[in-house]
UniProtKB/Swiss-Prot annotation:
SUPFAM superfamilies: beta and beta-prime subunits of DNA dependent RNA-polymerase (SSF64484)
Compartments, record wording: Plastid, Chloroplast
Protein name, UniProt field: DNA-directed RNA polymerase subunit beta
Catalytic activity: RNA(n) + a ribonucleoside 5'-triphosphate = RNA(n+1) + diphosphate
Family: Belongs to the RNA polymerase beta chain family.
GO molecular function annotation: DNA binding; DNA-directed RNA polymerase activity; ribonucleoside binding
Keywords: Chloroplast, DNA-directed RNA polymerase, Nucleotidyltransferase, Plastid, Transcription, Transferase
Lineage: Eukaryota, Viridiplantae, Streptophyta, Embryophyta, Tracheophyta
Species the sequence originates in: Saponaria officinalis
EC class: transferase
CC per GO annotation: chloroplast; DNA-directed RNA polymerase complex; mitochondrion
Role description: DNA-dependent RNA polymerase catalyzes the transcription of DNA into RNA using the four ribonucleoside triphosphates as substrates.
Coiled coil: none
E.C. code: 2.7.7.6
């Protein structure tokens, strides 16, 4: 979604990213669909294709959503469709979530972050990832490799998704270890490895028996999802130098979980340490539980106090339904310009919503909040607000690693990479 507090450069960043569909001719929209927009203008009809679930850098997902309904007249240069990470033609990489700056049972020690299960259940920080798996078929000295669904000595449930050609079907749900492409590589077996009946055939009839080795493409550990695209690329004259290639694209849906990394826009990043039930999160005086709990010790030593201003101004903007576009270094206008703006907006929000606790003159910007487990108020007033928080690409699913045994360094006895 759009940020409540921004810099004013979000629209330019979205335009320069190249993910928006921008109209090149003025006219009227006749038809809008998920994959195309048809536009009529100057006596011509133009079809503008939209990108659907395409793999992007870092295995993320690119998708365009139409913004303007059919029947509307548009001008040249207007935005027709939002792309990846844009909302209404502006950069929209994160969400405005309710945050409290306070310690909580040590779970936000060393920049760790405590989050509410609402972010999981309501898919606030759920992302789509597309992974590409590929396999090639070569012509070996024993003969060409074959793509087939008839693989001997394999359990039937591993082959359940293959079609008659030996390739996984579109729309199949695949889990770790499932076979995506069935492939057999011919190889000559040693005399001793033949079965007795094969040896008899060779001795009596002189029939050469060749064995095949199973070289299937299997889904690696940690991979699971839905097959959204299959591409079989065949080049003319299949030889060793231009083999056939099969690409399988798998879409994965990842909710936010313990070990993922989140960050604000002030370098205030952290790892999620625990996901709490909604009823256990600290809650405000109007009964709303907070979504995230950040450590207040991450602010003074790093001197990125802008996050506190953003947090409080976001709270006012969320209640007043306003968006603010503030350039950095606005202290040049007058002394303490940021503080004056934030406090005046908080005061206005407390007046309009008839909630005096939003702006308390004794501790402006802070509020008394309650422990969700006991219902008792915390000792000190706490800064609460709606900053813009992003989920980063550093996800625990890509980083988790383990090994049972392997090579060690002689001196330090540490495992080698």
């Amino acid at each position: 979604e759009k940020c409540i507090v921004g810099t004013g450069l979000e629209r330019q960043a979205a335009l320069d990213s190249g993910v928006l569909a921008i109209v090149e001719h003025e006219g009227k929209i006749i038809y809008t669909d998920t994959d195309k927009i048809i536009l009529s203008g100057n006596g011509d009809t133009h079809s503008i294709p939209l990108v659907l679930y395409q793999r992007f850098n870092k295995n993320t997902c690119m998708h365009q959503n139409p913004r303007i309904p059919g029947g509307k007249c548009i001008k040249k240069g207007q935005i027709l469709a939002d792309g990846a990470a844009t909302v209404g033609g502006e950069l929209g990489l994160g969400k405005n979530v309710l945050v409290a700056y306070m310690p909580w049972e040590g779970y936000n020690f060393e920049d760790a972050v405590l989050i509410s299960e609402r972010l999981v259940y309501e898919d606030i920080y759920t992302s789509f990832h597309i992974r590409k798996y590929e396999i090639q078929t070569y012509v070996t000295s024993q003969g060409p490799e074959r793509v087939t669904s008839e693989i001997p000595h394999l359990e039937a449930h591993l082959l359940r998704n293959l079609d008659k050609n030996g390739i996984v079907g579109l729309g199949s749900w695949v889990e770790t270890g499932d076979i995506l492409v069935g492939k057999l590589t011919p190889q000559m077996a040693k005399e001793s490895s033949y079965a007795p009946e094969d040896r008899l055939l060779r001795a009596i009839l002189g029939i050469q028996v060749s064995t095949s080795k199973e070289t299937c493409l299997k889904l690696p550990i940690g991979g699971r999802g839905r097959v959204i695209d299959v591409r079989w690329i065949q080049k003319k004259g299949g030889s060793n130098y231009n083999p056939e290639t099969i690409h399988i694209y798998i879409l994965q849906k990842r909710e936010i979980k313990v070990g993922d990394k989140v960050a604000g826009r002030h370098g205030n990043k952290g790892i999620i340490s625990k996901i709490l039930p909604r009823q256990d999160m600290p809650y405000l005086q109007d009964g709303r539980p907070v979504d995230m709990v950040f450590n207040p010790l991450g602010v003074p030593s790093r001197m990125n106090v802008g996050q506190i201003f953003e947090c409080s101004l976001g709270l006012a903007g969320g209640l007043l339904d306003r968006h603010y576009r503030i350039t950095p270094f606005d202290e040049r206008y007058e002394h303490e310009a940021s503080r004056k703006l934030v406090f005046s907006e908080l005061y206005q929000a407390s007046k309009q919503t008839a909630k005096p606790w939003i702006f308390e003159p004794e501790y402006p910007g802070k509020s008394r909040i309650f422990d969700g487990r006991t219902g008792d108020p915390f000792e000190q007033p706490v800064i609460i607000g709606n900053p813009y928080i992003l989920k980063l690409i550093h996800q625990v699913d890509d980083k988790i690693h383990g090994r049972s045994s392997g090579h060690y360094a002689l001196v330090t006895q540490q495992p080698l990479r």
